[in-house]
């Protein structure tokens, strides 16, 4: 998030609040070297207190303070303002109030009104392979293997129970003997489980 405050629009306030400190050494506020044509401004606490006390509470608005602590907000605002010592104009202000020469000015101009050209030529390739090896998951390994129930009764004298068949539709089914034997075995297993419970 970027907060820009135009100090030059308040000349009477900025002249009484800020005291200019020019230095060619490394600034503790920004951590970078300051050239001869640049200077940073720092807050004057007495001037700020005098300014805030001179205004009525109804006149104090968001432009005076961006936080609940006016002095903290004022300190943040003033430390963020970088000026040109030759012209005395804030570099963060509008383009019409900037000095005519760009010497000593740190500027970043964004020409967004001309449009943004984006080259969006995307090459996509999708390949689907269905020849994947089936891997056994851990869930399959952790499953309990119950004993298989096999019912083989191929003897000719085995009596089939047709009482619940579907009107004789399966009379010639070759799996009929195995089906009834398996069904009888399942009934016995179910009855045994019920008795055990």
UniProtKB/Swiss-Prot annotation:
Region (Disordered): 16-36, 85-106, 129-167
Position of the signal peptide: none
One Gene Ontology cellular component: host cell cytoplasm
Compartment annotation: Host cytoplasm
Keyword Plastid: no
GO MF entries: ATP hydrolysis activity; magnesium ion binding; nucleotide binding; RNA binding
Main location: host cell
Stretches with biased composition (Polar residues): 91-104
Modified residues (Phosphoserine): 67, 153, 155, 163, 165
Key words, A-Z: Glycoprotein, Host cytoplasm, Host-virus interaction, Magnesium, Metal-binding, Nucleotide-binding, Phosphoprotein, RNA-binding
Family per similarity comment: Belongs to the rotavirus NSP5 family.
Name assigned to this protein: Non-structural protein 5
